[in-house]
């Protein structure tokens, strides 16, 4: 089946009874995918994108999941077709199937790609929590707060139309996460601390500092740990990938308690004959070089501010 597990966050932890390598494993969950039968719509199963700037020669991408071929397969936006067919992410039976499949794979929880309440991904989050509670499975967030700083929230609440107003609403969203996600039986907890992935690119550091100042933690809760996406691109020199080893922006995020964490490796090489269908790509050596700054400055660091260290794996 087409796995919704697009990335794995391997979180260092010293508690017994977890993964055999002593780490907790969280999988990023991208949604929401619907079906006509269950939801009356298709969601991320369909896709259209203008790709006129691509040097591959392909001018557009178009997947219409309402179209069905002679073998009964829908034209879905997916690299591989699901073994169980096209399903709705909100179907409790399918949620149960995915959670149990994840547990078999020694995955401890899902981080839902989430931007704000009441975005559709918040519905997915809450539906996941209902089923996860039955199976000792954790549901957290990959907080894409850029969604909040686009005009998406303004389309729902017209009065939230300035950065100041969006920052104020972000504080309410953080409080919601504290009250509804970082507590309870499905809370993602590592070493006694709630944890989430902070994708960005929404709030600036000063705005985020204001958000933190307005959030009230319940008695006994430790400050949630934010694993901050560090995805500086790097460059090619003499056909060798050279990663970014530090950045002023990431240093600023560390000042508000965020811990630098890897994301998708940089793809700095441009299309060639062997990679004709890609505008950019990376070699295996590039990927290793991309990860070295995280190894050297985070994993091997004795900095006590790095209370939780997270690695990254992508199938």
Regions found by a protein language model. Give the residues of each.
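Sec-dependent N-terminal signal peptides
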Residues: 4-13
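Single-residue recognition of alpha-helix boundary sites
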Residues: 13-14, 203
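Sec/Tat signal peptide C-region and signal peptidase I cleavage site
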Residues: 15-19
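Glycan-processing catalytic domains of CAZymes
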Residues: 20-315
